[in-house]
Amino acid sequence: MGRRKKIVEQCERLMDNPEQIRNIAIAAHVDHGKTTLTDNLLAGAGMISEDTAGQQLAMDTEEDEQERGITIDAANVSMTHEYEGDDHLINLIDTPGHVDFGGDVTRAMRAVDGALVVVDAVEGAMPQTETVVRQALREGVKPTLFINKVDRLISELQEGPEEMQERLLSVIGDVNELIRGMTEEKDDIEDWTVSVEDGTVAFGSALYKWGVSMPSMQRTGMDFGDIIDLERSDKREELHEQTPLADVVLDMVAEHFPNPIDAQPRRIPTVWRGDADSEIAESMRLVDEDGEVVLMVTDIGVDPHAGEIAAGRVFSGTLEKGQELYVSGTAGKNRVQSVGIYMGGEREEVDEVPAGNIAAVTGLKDAIAGSTVSNEEMTPFESIDHISEPVITKSIEAQNMDDLPKLIETLRQVSKEDPTISIEINEDTGEHLISGQGELHLEVQTQRIERNQGIPVTTGEPIVVYRETPTSDSQEVEGVSPNRHNKFYITVEQLSDDVLEEIRLGEVSMDMPEQERREVLQEAGMDKETSQDVENIIGRNIFIDDTKGIQHLNETMELVVDGLTDSLEDGPLAAEPVEGALIRLHDARLHEDAIHRGPAQVIPATRDAVHRALIDADIRLLEPIQDVRIDVPSEHMGAASGEVQGRRGRVDDMYQEGDLMVVEGIAPVDEMIGFSSDIRSATEGRASWNTENAGFRVMADNLQREIIMEIRERKGMKTELPESITHF
């Protein structure tokens, strides 16, 4: 029997025993060694050769991943590991580390119960480390820590036992500070922090395949002195044989990560807001393989032979070929064509996948990342809220008009596979817009369209995504319908930062129970009366109905919301989305005859009123910003900080870390386009840097008019602003 077939059979045998299952993700900052570590785990499980582990990068299956040397797509694999006499099934997802592909990390966290956070011993916790820890904790996923590249402390930095211990404890302290800061409201904070003593921290070198933890040192009798001696003597093979990395890490996974039976009762209330007393809730809590089928789709991929593959977590029931299942948000049922598990880049079909496992399913043609799939209609899972959002846009056109239909179909597929990509299709002009997390994100997607689909495309220069926001409160504005028979009286106020943050994080929505929504809004600072009158949440804005007993308003309210939505999707400055507005409807006068208060009357009246109220509330343009961190030798520190400041940026901190200086600051995304080549040139290639999207800020008044005019011209709008705009 082939090795691969044997492993698949072992996995199938363990699938029915959720106590022996561990669903985990490996997550880290870019280049901290996740995929090299995953190679070691695959070799330890007998899935690839130990000789090639670390160089094979078996989970980076796409050509561009191998070329660039980074993980772009999250990749799944199932493996087995024996721990304390019991076989365990480990379903592992290797996630990207580059900030532009953070959406894959967010989606992976919904499918797993444990996150193995990898940190470079030399660099320490970095911006994306903080992001992945935050993503894990928001999803109720327990972290453990692997500190990688310890060999560099010994061989490159020549650190002794005391210096090493100090540095490693500093890394652990930084990670625990992140965990504590994000779990303040949990009662079991100590259960979430990691420590050497309890075995939730391991150290080692993924490149040289050795690792240690407190339990492994107690078992083998090795200490850090022995490790330093063997590493300095270049006896790395002996070190690997005495304390192999895969055993140390997989033992930690089996011992400290929860199995689905322990995890699901705790996680279900976090990710699902349905009736907690229902049969389906009980079935998910119990991980009941005989219950109703419930699958949460976390990823969509395309196989050239099998078509679309939906990957996700089976929370209840058993998935089988031929089942007819509902997909949330769509009509009718989809028929399951096949079910399987992942073996790195390949999918292995199996007869069934029971609750508690991660499955690969074909036939769910209507599913997208975030879909709830079930054999009975049910309350869907909470949407997967991505921490970052699109900040860069490019136009994309087919070079040959014959390819236009295929390009449109491909773009729609791209946005289905990657929800952090936003697509705007204009079938009239043939020019389409693709928006993503950064330059690399868009570059990878456009190259894949050309390479995988064979469509030559032309892309425009990167364009930054802007927003509009009120900066004060407006006077009451009257909106009048074209027939003069309907009037609406509206004001606009600023939403507080805390309320806006709750909306951005998905903590408050119209999908949640009304009482719960009120409580969240009041905790964020909204007064009780206002929280009780929330009529709708439109994007990142809140609509309050302050009216009392207006005749015919109930049957007209849907049109009022449509008008508000129109006005907020295209703000009055540059037709950019509006955020941070609280719109109040104070009064209305409606014609008694429904034919005179239809869409053509109500929508323009409310849209116009909101736009004029926004202008009166001193609406301004918001620009996206990025946190910037540059690690550079001290002689180039001035050049590095100059690169940030010369881009309308601000340097917030400069400090020494090891033999390098660290420059930390903030800069507008628009000015950071082309930063890579400029920072290399300014520092003679000696700098390493990281950027992370940090939301939006109000653009300086002296730049507002110029940028607004550029946007309006690009969109084919009039290049003069309404006369009433006088606040900048």
UniProtKB/Swiss-Prot annotation:
What GO terms in the biological process aspect are recorded for it?
translational elongation
Q: Which UniProt keywords apply?
A: Cytoplasm, Elongation factor, GTP-binding, Nucleotide-binding, Protein biosynthesis
Cellular localisation = Cytoplasm
Identify the CDD domains for this entry.
aeEF2_snRNP_like_IV, EF2, EF2_II, Elongation_Factor_C
Q: Which Pfam families match?
A: EFG_C, EFG_III, EFG_IV, GTP_EFTU, GTP_EFTU_D2
SMART domains the UniProt entry points to: EFG_C, EFG_IV
Chain ranges of the tr-type G domain:
19-261
The residues that hold GTP are: 28-35, 94-98, 148-151
What does UniProt give as GO cellular component? cytosol; ribonucleoprotein complex
Q: Which residues carry this modification: Diphthamide?
A: H596
Q: Which residues cross the membrane?
A: none
Entries under PROSITE patterns matching the protein: G_TR_1, G_TR_2
Q: Name one GO molecular function term.
A: GTP binding
State if Ubl conjugation is listed as a keyword. no
| Recorded family membership | Belongs to the TRAFAC class translation factor GTPase superfamily. Classic translation factor GTPase family. EF-G/EF-2 subfamily.
Q: Name the job this protein performs.
A: Catalyzes the GTP-dependent ribosomal translocation step during translation elongation. During this step, the ribosome changes from the pre-translocational (PRE) to the post-translocational (POST) state as the newly formed A-site-bound peptidyl-tRNA and P-site-bound deacylated tRNA move to the P and E sites, respectively. Catalyzes the coordinated movement of the two tRNA molecules, the mRNA and conformational changes in the ribosome.
Kindly give the PANTHER family that the UniProt entry links to this protein. Answer: ELONGATION FACTOR-LIKE GTPASE 1, TRANSLATION ELONGATION FACTOR-RELATED
Protein name (record): Elongation factor 2
| Encoding gene per record | fusA
